Amino acid sequence: QVTPAALKQIFIDLKMRKETDENAEWNKEMALQRAYIDELDTKLIEILGKRMKLAEKIGQLKKEKNVAILQNKRWNEILGRMILDGEEKGLNEEFVLKIYKAIHQESITHQEKIINK
């Protein structure tokens, strides 16, 4: 339960932020930074697409030799390396784990399609 004093402090600490600003220079800089982000987002999707194509090729190789899709040793090596690389670039470990688990699951899905043909 929140006391009246605590509620008062919450309101004091509360900062209402504007959705945008009318300053032309600020808007120009925001547009520039957002354009950079858009460009990087496009590259991320492009790279992920290429990665999935490679996962499919690996799936084909595994199919030819009847090798299991999930390779725990390899997965653990990738995770460890990516966590360290992420930390060096200021990325939170949990964030890196979430991203790579999603990428890994998508890779498995692509390989399953190949193996189950």
Language model segments and positions:
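Domain-level signature for soluble enzymes in the chorismate/prephenate branch of the shikimate pathway
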Residues: 1-117
